[in-house]
Amino acid sequence: FFRKIDPNHKFHWEWAPSRGKSGGILCGLNKENFDILMTKCGKYILQLNLFDKNKNCSWALMTVYGAAHDEQKPEFIAELSSMCHSSNIPYLVGGDFNIIRHSGEKNKKTSLSHFSEVFNSVIHLLGLREIYMTGGSYTWSNKQESRLWKSWIEFSCLLSGRIYTLLPLSISW
């Protein structure tokens, strides 16, 4: 598989295995830009502590595939909170959280669940900020102005307060 997508071996590849019906997590990083200092694999999160060769600093990338079923969401939220709290370097959290944060994320009117409230509280307590996708239409939006959020295509990105100084072009607040 990797020979087809990376025939020149320019990427570090790390993955978390699939669990039950949930897919796994695959993350590739360009070797010219990053060294992987540490890998931590949770049930829902693959954390890579990186050395950024261009910025000459370390930061963590946490790739998420959140629990799809309500009975597992508390475990996912606890893992997210624990991994973020234990990081002693700036971090970026991105992936499919499988939790609707705001009612505007769906094309249908739905009320927010208890998990949405808990998830938003954790994000607030951790001081995370969301990077909103802007610009042109996306392939999953059916070329419409507004995004259609479907659990298998959603990608959200949250930043710890310390990392925005490393990635100034991605955000402004």
Indicate residue ranges for each PLM-predicted region.
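A shared catalytic/ligand-binding motif for oxyanion handling
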Residues: F1-W173
